[in-house]
Amino acid sequence: MRKSDRSRLQQLWFALAGTLICASGALAQQSPPQRPQPIVAWSAKPVETTAWTAPNKPHWKLADVLTKHSGQRSWQEDIVSDRDFIARYISMAPGEKSKRQFFADDRVFWIVQSGRMRVSIDGQQPFVATQGFMVQVPYRVAYSIETEGSEPSLRFEVRGAQAVPLYPIDETPVPMDGKKYMKVTYTGHGAYDEVNKPYLDFIKDVVNANGRGGPFVKDDKTFANMIRGPGQPAPPASNLGHFHIGYSEFWLVLEGKIDYLIEGVPFFTAEPGDVVYAPQGRWHRASFGGNGMATRLAINPRPDGMHNFQAPED
């Protein structure tokens, strides 16, 4: 290569490198993408606020549930029952084991409140879940739970409102009122993906890692989303939050303190293990309370559900 050609080639490389450096610097200085601008519209809020129907109520305190079942080792307490979900606290005595079962078209998930449980899910290695573990099983995938150790295991479990347990052919079904178990054939089953994992160790993977939260369950009809942040002063009472149309929402407090303002209910604070329920159409506002970090698991049937916020005054 002639000297003049080599010189021109070096100049070209220097020019190209300078262009790349300038471009990367410009990209670094660009601001993050902005949120979409709110759209002002007419929404249909119920004239009469939707009532709570048992077992649903504004605030279930875990302490009250435990007091009610004091001295019992194996028990269940229904906490939520509506069009979309059934959620309950379930305590299993040491050594107690569930039958292998699955659900036809719904995921089931639970959060371990205390104790140790051995979880066996078809297609996965068995694992032991302890306090703070969040576990989910896709539809038509059989699983079982067994309490380990000398203490009961306690979990908060959520399943579809119309979901009933089905059983592998080598299992004996538990009789159910109004149902007759019979042999059938079926095909296919659900699967895990980038969002939906067999389990999450909330204490290890989120709290100790100072994680940000995010969805744990997300499909076409179930959304369980961890919302995490530092404690802050409560917003003014004039901040009503938002409401939903056609579906209700509930939260399990995972960490810290969560402040709530729900239409028709005085301001209150919920603590770990507590469950809060807002019927469809009611204004509700959740905020991080206390001095440390706080996390709530928001549960509803609409991953991209509409949030009806207050419109600016004219």
Residue ranges: model-predicted function:
Residues 88, 99, 108, 125, ...:
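Short, conserved secondary-structure segments in the cores of folded domains
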